[in-house]
Every structure is written in C-alpha cells, then in structure tokens.
UniProtKB/Swiss-Prot annotation:
Lineage of producing organism: Eukaryota, Metazoa, Chordata, Craniata, Vertebrata
Species of the source: Dendroaspis viridis
Protein name (Swiss-Prot/TrEMBL): Alpha-elapitoxin-Dv2a
Keyword Secreted belongs to the record: yes
Paired cysteines (S-S): C3-C21, C14-C42, C27-C31, C46-C57, C58-C63
UniProt-listed Gene3D superfamilies: CD59
Amino acid sequence: RTCYKTPSVKPETCPHGENICYTETWCDAWCSQRGKRVELGCAATCPKVKAGVGIKCCSTDNCNPFPVWNPRG
C-alpha cells in the first residue's frame, strides 16, 4: 500500500501490515488564521482519536491527499 504522509505530503510505501491510509485534522491556536492542522499517514487499523479531532480512513493507494480548504470570505 502507498499513502500520502506528512510532512512530505508525497506518496510513500507503508510498512508491512499497515494497509490503511488516514487523514487526521484538528484545530490549534492558529486555526482561525491558518486552518486546521493535518497529519497524513499509514496504519494497521483506523486510528482512534480524541474529541475535536477528525479522522478519515481509506484502503486504496494514495486515497488520502492533503485536504482542500474553502477560503473564508
């Protein structure tokens, strides 16, 4: 399996046994100016996250590109 990974945001081969790609998003102190923080990677199972953290998991190659944010205006 290949997934996008941060910080490079380029497709990389996942370690053996990690067949899930994920996109995790959350707000920090700069969220209102910079948008949500994003982490991309591979996992054996879809990661469990805390309240306030978004997670999307998928199981095809390169299915977790960096999210496109709608500009405020």
